[in-house]
From Swiss-Prot:
Alphabetical keyword list: Detoxification, FAD, Flavoprotein, Heme, Iron, Metal-binding, NAD, NADP, Oxidoreductase, Oxygen transport, Transport
FAD-binding FR-type domain residues: 150-255
The species this protein was found in: Vibrio parahaemolyticus serotype O3:K6 (strain RIMD 2210633)
Cofactor note (record): Binds 1 heme b (iron(II)-protoporphyrin IX) group per subunit. Binds 1 FAD per subunit.
Signal sequence, start to end: none
The protein's name: Flavohemoprotein
Length: 394
């Protein structure tokens, strides 16, 4: 527990931190990577360059300071971050390194005096212990399951298939020939790439894009313009190549009984976690509505596969939006609507009792979806979303 003195000091200095903005976390990361360059093998340096990770950490620090007297309010954020940390295999020692550089950053930017530094050090220590304990629980849970493991495990690429103009699926099988641990539909897999093409080890998380299989994992990756790892996977990773994987993780997953109505909404490569959910609903009794938005048929991944899943079940329905259909794309056959997703078209599905809505896609798309869900009266506790990359509130 934090002392009252520490709480008051953190509250008093929080406005100064907030006023500084992401400059604080920029200084922190620059300092940490200078003194501990080995951490460049852990952090996504692309997110450092575009500022996303710096903004995410700054927002987390501000949220912690704002809720210093109400830590339970942070449990949702802690769960999300803890899962991501286990995919990076974060250790207790690394928390100590981060704490050292965070306190040094506050000292160098503000020179607030030892009392303030001690208060922030105490506050950081309490939060770090919360993460360390939760992450240890996740590590142990993963390792204790059948087919589970802790740390990294070697897999072989046994399948590679282009799903659209920009999305390719990769199927991995463990080289030891044993089973793989089960996961919850919507979770992701951590992939570790070491190549002489990269200055540092690169770690990425990709949503598992199929229902649970006994011996394999499938991810489906969009080729991002300028994306180091996505382009490497598309162009360089071939059948028979070996990679190291961390166990499945993530707090975005579907957990419903067979009588709960489900709506799955996605845009672009955001369909990967929702496809895993859809494949897992083949024995579902309640209505299932699939909504997907993409540019046109050239970008429409898993089109035939989803059609087969939906047409095989009377309780499933699919609606497709194309933003820029080609001359060959036929409305009513390839897609149903043009432009941006309008959830009023599925208002009846969203008005069902206890309907659970899962959505994923670009941040702007998810903000558009969340706004419509609120307008249609869907309770916030009944919709769930996933951001690819550092988390953003929609």
């Amino acid at each position: 527990m934090l002392s009252n003195q520490t709480i008051e000091i953190v509250k008093a200095t929080a406005p100064l931190i907030a006023e500084t903005g992401p400059k604080l976390t920029a200084h922190f990361y620059d300092r940490m990577f200078t003194h501990n360059p080995e951490l460049k093998d852990i952090f996504n340096m692309s997110n450092q360059r575009n500022g996303d990770q710096r903004e995410a950490l700054f927002n987390a620090i501000c949220a912690y300071a704002a809720n210093i007297e109400n830590l339970p309010a942070l449990l949702g954020a802690v769960e999300k971050i803890a899962h991501k940390h286990t995919s990076f295999l974060i250790t207790k020692d690394q928390y100590q390194i981060v704490g050292k550089h965070l306190i040094a950053t506050i000292d160098e930017l503000f020179n607030p005096g030892q009392e303030v530094l001690d208060a922030w050090a105490e506050a950081y220590g309490v939060l770090a212990n919360v993460f360390i304990q939760r992450e240890e629980q996740i590590y142990q849970a993963n390792a204790s399951q059948e087919g589970g493991w802790r740390g990294l495990r070697e897999f072989e690429l046994v399948g590679k298939q282009l799903e659209s103009e920009h999305i390719c699926s990769f199927v991995f099988k463990p080289t030891d020939g044993s089973k793989v641990t089960k996961y919850k539909p919507g979770q992701y897999l951590g992939i570790y790439i070491n190549s002489d093409k990269f200055e540092n080890q690169e770690i990425r998380q990709y949503s598992l894009s199929s229902s649970v299989q006994e011996n394999t994992y499938r991810i489906s990756v969009k080729r991002e313009q300028g994306g180091k790892v996505s382009n490497y996977l598309h162009d360089e990773l071939n059948i028979g190549d070996k990679v190291k994987l961390a166990a499945p993780a993530g707090d975005f997953f579907m957990d419903v009984d067979t009588n709960t109505p489900v709506v799955l909404i996605s845009a672009g490569v955001g369909l990967t976690p929702t496809l895993s959910m859809l494949e897992s609903l083949t024995e579902h009794h309640a209505p299932v509505t699939w909504v997907h938005a993409t540019e046109n048929s050239k970008h429409h991944a898993f089109k035939e596969h989803v059609n087969q899943l939906v047409t095989a079940k009377e309780n499933m329905n699919a609606l497709i939006w194309y933003n820029q259909p080609t001359a060959e794309d036929k409305i009513g056959e390839d897609f149903h609507f043009t432009g941006f997703v309008n959830l009023h078209e599925i208002e009846a599905a969203l008005k069902q009792d206890n309907v659970q809505v899962y959505f994923c896609g670009p941040v702007g798309f998810m903000q558009h979806v969340a706004k419509q869900l609120q307008e249609l009266g869907v309770p916030q506790e009944q919709f769930h979303y996933e951001c690819f990359g550092p988390h953003k509130v929609v």
